[in-house]
Amino acid sequence: MTKSQKIELVSKLEEGFKASEAVVVCNYKGLNTKKLEELRNNAREMDVKVQIIKNTLASIALKNAGKDGMELKDTNIYLWGEDQLNVSKVADKFSEANQTFEIKTAFIDGEVASVDKVKALAKMPSRNELLAMLLQVWNAPITNFTIGLNALKEKKEAE
């Protein structure tokens, strides 16, 4: 890779990291190409970017994006996106399914986050799931009232 290509890659990564709410760094050592493609497909469905980047280039891009402080060692794959829940869910789900894939560190909410925080975020319901739960709670009294009225109507008709 030439120096100009590296500079271009760093600037593209910097833009992506700046626009993202979360960056998760994982160890992918031992994963075959088929598994990596599976990860990329899962990430694409959730609007999460996935890329294997040299640590030095990633370090420069993260620092320029204001997201430095993560310890970057060994073989890393980077996941980032605008929705921190989606990024966390993709990383956690894939790490549970594949023993060799492990979450190492992350940058969430303007700070370096632990693996436990990433896993906790992954367990949280998404915005759409929360809205569905809220609507279900709001509709429950009306639904129960309607069921009661129908039961009363049927009872009156039976008499």
UniProtKB/Swiss-Prot annotation:
Keywords: Ribonucleoprotein, Ribosomal protein, RNA-binding, rRNA-binding. It comes from Campylobacter lari (strain RM2100 / D67 / ATCC BAA-1060). GO terms for biological process: translation. Coiled coil: none annotated. Belongs to the universal ribosomal protein uL10 family. Forms part of the ribosomal stalk, playing a central role in the interaction of the ribosome with GTP-bound translation factors. HAMAP family: Ribosomal_uL10 (MF_00362). InterPro entries: Ribosomal_uL10 (IPR001790), Ribosomal_uL10-like_sf (IPR043141), Ribosomal_uL10_bac (IPR022973), Ribosomal_uL10_bac_type (IPR047865), Ribosomal_uL10_CS_bac (IPR002363). One of its GO terms (cellular component) is large ribosomal subunit. Part of the ribosomal stalk of the 50S ribosomal subunit. The N-terminus interacts with L11 and the large rRNA to form the base of the stalk. The C-terminus forms an elongated spine to which L12 dimers bind in a sequential fashion forming a multimeric L10(L12)X complex. One of its GO terms (molecular function) is structural constituent of ribosome. This is Large ribosomal subunit protein uL10. Gene3D superfamilies: 3.30.70.1730, 6.10.250.290.
